[in-house]
Amino acid sequence: MSENHKYYYMKLKETFFNDSKILLLEQMQDGPLYILLLLKFYLISLPYNGLLLVSENMPHTFQTLAIVTRYQVGTVERAIKIFLKFGLI
């Protein structure tokens, strides 16, 4: 029995890691971890047109994002605050 899979694509600019916001983020304590978390958020949001949703009408919480990204809730909360401040999400 074959399974049907949906594939999504995300384009990053060639200069993504040279963007001033990403460079600032990278220099922070836990910065590289936050960059990976940001990319995970971008990928999680692909099926929902850029929204962080668990399903059609159910938004993610800090707890659910922590589970699906395999990070601690506190790390997710701190990262989201930084991403909002930088305008990354």
Annotate each language-model stretch with its function:
Residues M1-I89:
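Positively charged, structured surface patches that bind polyanionic biopolymers
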